[in-house]
């Protein structure tokens, strides 16, 4: 799950070579992006001060396969890690043991999380011609009544069509046949993926359809490219009107969504849906916290992290195993190089991002007395492909501009990785709760041109991560973390 307001600037699958000039910085507001290029002779005191350390990190980081080895252990020996599952418990224990063995101070912090369990799932066209339809229940969906639901299908392609057909929706299963736009490398920020244009139907569709009396929903999988792949994701009942019963929801392949839409154009379609999902009482999980303790400013903290949980399909390699191991290997690389910064770099592996975000909320609450001395919080939650730069910002607008400018200076050290882009954004899901306390929020950005081909599906497996690009991610992250943790002043200071 990603924060929809987040603008993630991406590169083409094969980015063009960079000319030997100052980096391009993208500055974004809510809708308009302005390209600014600094002069080649413009002063960059941060880059000048840390170029030697950055070169050491980049040279060592590009050849370091530690992150990939960690990711292979996590995905191949544990696998997917839904909140409340034994697999997530094992992953937490693995992360603690791994970072303790590397010499870091590690502990866990209790978090109570939702406990949703997938059961048997069935889908089929009943009329006009019987045909089985593969499906995948949406996370947090309620179960169907025992024996399932058999009802007519109503196909909609947007919210207006749902409103216009509200009379037909009563007693029906609504199919949200919403095509995710293809990746557009020329579109700014998160618009390049098309995810933001479609994911709202997955999360809010059931509540809206239930308001008109629907008995269930089907969602076209949120992906632009499919080879009959099913993509799950969180279904939310937050918008459900008082007194309206929750209804079940499932994802179907883009191919089957189009098939059902064509059938419905020819005449009535009846569908059978059966989901045996369970929502059990909340259960105990934990955030993992590991400190690479600083020197003379050790009480000040740079938080870097990813979410250790995943959906219950695939291996959770790109979402978000890659983000976790990038951060774990960042402090390992710096320690190996003997680059101990002035401030403490803290790795946080959050629990329950996918279906509750309770780990993020719990961390911000548990550490509220430290947030005034938390100088930056970074998240990586868009896979393990090539790094392209950083999103950055702060709640205070003036401070946000300063943060973006300084992160851009640091990113200029990453020209050899073609990771110099910087945009101003609101922050990603797990770091966002720290924003109101004034913590600068940063995201490690990646090439996401293929990310949503595998996202939340059985195809999210280790083979989708290239060892070299993952090593480059670690190198980019280590440069940012080290410089910010070692600077004389905070990156948001006037």
Model-predicted regions and their roles:
Residues 85, 134-241, 246-248, 315:
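Extracellular/luminal Protease-associated
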Residues 62, 130-132, 146, 151, ...:
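Metal-dependent peptidase/peptidase-like ectodomains
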Residues 46, 50-54, 66-71, 78, ...:
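Stable alpha-helical elements in mature extracytoplasmic
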Residues 332, 336, 452-494:
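His/Asp/Glu-rich mid-to-C-terminal helical/loop segments that flank catalytic regions of hydrolases
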Residues 51-53, 127, 134-136, 140-166, ...:
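Soluble metallo-hydrolase cores and metallopeptidase-like ectodomains found primarily
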Residues 99, 201, 209, 288, ...:
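Alpha-helical metal-binding/catalytic segments enriched in His/Glu/Asp
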Residues 42-53, 61, 72, 76-187:
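Noncatalytic luminal/extracellular "stalk/propeptide" segments of secretory-pathway proteins
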């Amino acid at each position: 799950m990603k924060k929809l307001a987040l603008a993630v600037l991406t590169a083409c699958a094969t980015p063009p070579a960079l000319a030997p000039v100052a980096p391009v910085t993208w500055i974004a507001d809510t809708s308009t992006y302005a390209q600014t290029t600094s002069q080649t002779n413009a002063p960059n005191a941060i880059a000048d001060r840390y170029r030697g350390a950055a070169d050491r990190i980049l040279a060592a980081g590009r050849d370091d396969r530690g992150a990939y080895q960690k990711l292979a252990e996590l995905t191949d020996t544990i696998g997917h890690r839904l909140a409340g599952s034994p697999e997530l418990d094992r992953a937490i224990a693995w992360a603690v043991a791994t970072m303790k063995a590397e010499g870091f101070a590690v502990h866990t912090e209790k978090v109570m999380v939702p406990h949703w369990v997938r059961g048997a799932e069935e889908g089929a066209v009943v009329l006009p011609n019987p045909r089985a339809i593969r499906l995948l229940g949406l996370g947090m969906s309620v179960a169907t009544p025992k024996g399932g639901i058999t009802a007519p299908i109503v196909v909609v392609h947007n919210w207006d069509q749902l409103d216009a057909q509200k009379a037909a929706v009563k007693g029906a299963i609504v199919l949200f046949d919403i095509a995710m736009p293809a990746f557009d490398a020329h579109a700014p920020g998160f618009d390049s993926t098309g995810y933001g244009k479609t994911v709202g139907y997955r999360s809010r569709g059931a509540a809206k359809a239930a308001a008109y009396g629907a008995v269930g929903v089907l969602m076209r999988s949120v992906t632009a490219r499919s080879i009959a792949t099913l993509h799950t994701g969180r279904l939310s009942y937050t918008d459900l009107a008082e007194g309206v019963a929750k209804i079940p929801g499932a994802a179907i392949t883009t191919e089957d969504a189009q098939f059902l839409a064509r059938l419905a154009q020819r005449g009535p379609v009846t569908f059978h849906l059966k989901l045996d999902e369970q929502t059990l009482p909340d259960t105990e999980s934990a955030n993992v916290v590991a400190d690479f303790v600083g020197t003379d400013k050790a009480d000040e903290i740079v938080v870097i992290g990813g979410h250790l949980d995943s959906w219950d399909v695939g291996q959770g390699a790109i979402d978000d195993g890659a983000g976790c191991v990038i951060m774990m290997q960042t402090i390992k690389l710096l320690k190996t190089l003997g680059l101990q910064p002035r401030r403490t770099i803290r790795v946080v592996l959050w629990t329950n991002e996918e279906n509750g975000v309770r780990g993020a909320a719990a961390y911000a609450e548990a550490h509220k007395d430290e947030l005034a001395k938390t100088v930056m919080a970074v998240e990586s939650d868009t896979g393990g492909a090539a790094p392209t730069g950083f999103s950055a910002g702060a709640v205070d607008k003036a401070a946000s501009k300063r943060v973006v400018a300084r992160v851009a200076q640091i990113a200029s050290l990453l020209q050899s990785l073609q990771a110099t882009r910087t945009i101003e954004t609101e922050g990603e899901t797990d770091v966002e709760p720290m924003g109101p306390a004034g913590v600068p929020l940063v995201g490690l950005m990646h090439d996401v041109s293929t990310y949503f081909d595998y996202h939340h599906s059985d195809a999210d497996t280790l083979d989708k991560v290239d060892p070299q690009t993952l090593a480059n991610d670690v190198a980019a992250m280590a440069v940012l973390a080290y410089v910010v943790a070692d600077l004389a002043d905070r990156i948001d200071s006037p």
